[in-house]
Amino acid sequence: MKTATAVVLLLFAFTSKSYFFGVANAANSPVLDTDGDELQTGVQYYVLSSISGAGGGGLALGRATGQSCPEIVVQRRSDLDNGTPVIFSNADSKDDVVRVSTDVNIEFVPIRDRLCSTSTVWRLDNYDNSAGKWWVTTDGVKGEPGPNTLCSWFKIEKAGVLGYKFRFCPSVCDSCTTLCSDIGRHSDDDGQIRLALSDNEWAWMFKKASKTIKQVVNAKH
C-alpha cells in the first residue's frame, strides 16, 4: 500500500511539474509578427489593428490640442496608413526576442524631424481627471528597470487567434504597488483615437517596417 501511494505521489509530482513547466513556457512564448517570425528587439515594426478595414490604421505619434510636447499615442483612422514604426526593448537586455507577459519598452521611430526634444518611449501618463482616463503618452525612460521607471514598461499578451493586446502591469519592481490593466482605444475630446487603460482591450498585430528588415530577421533563423 505504501509503495502504491508513493508511486501515485511520484506520478502526481512529475505530472504537476510538467504541467507548470508547460504553463511557464507558454507564458513566455515569442510574440510573432505578420510573417510568423519572432519579434526582435531593435527591429522596426508597424503596430496595426488586427481587424482590417473598420479597425483603423496603425499607431503613431500625435499631439493633443494645446499641448505640443510630449506627444501622445494615437491610431490613424485609415487602414491604408501604417502609422509610425516602433522598436521594442526588453527589461531583460540579454534576450533579443520579444516574449508575451514580459516587460518591454516601446519606442516610436519618427520618420521625420520632430519639434519635441522629449523621448518617444511610451509611458503611462498621470490620471486625466477631466477625461477619466489613464492615457498612454510618450517621454518615457528607456531601460533602467526599477521603481523609477515603472510607467515606461508594458506587456504584450495574446488576444484571440492572431492578435495581441497591450497591458500595463509592470513587474520590474517586486516591492512596488502598481496598476494592472489592459489597454484599449478611446476617443479624446478632439476626436483622436488614443490608447488608455481599459476593461476592453484591442487586438493588434506587428508588421515589419521594410523588406530589408524582413531579410535581416529571416537570416537569424
Curated annotation (Swiss-Prot):
Keyword Nucleus applies: no
Disulfide bonds: 69-116
GO molecular function terms attached to this record: endopeptidase inhibitor activity
Keywords in alphabetical order: Disulfide bond, Signal
Database matches in SUPFAM superfamilies: STI-like (SSF50386)
First and last residue of the signal peptide: 1-26
Keyword Oxidoreductase part of the UniProt annotation: no
InterPro entries given in the database record: Kunitz_inhibitor_STI-like_sf, Prot_inh_Kunz-lg
Family assignment from sequence similarity: Belongs to the protease inhibitor I3 (leguminous Kunitz-type inhibitor) family.
Name this protein carries in UniProt: 21 kDa seed protein
Organism from which the protein derives: Theobroma cacao
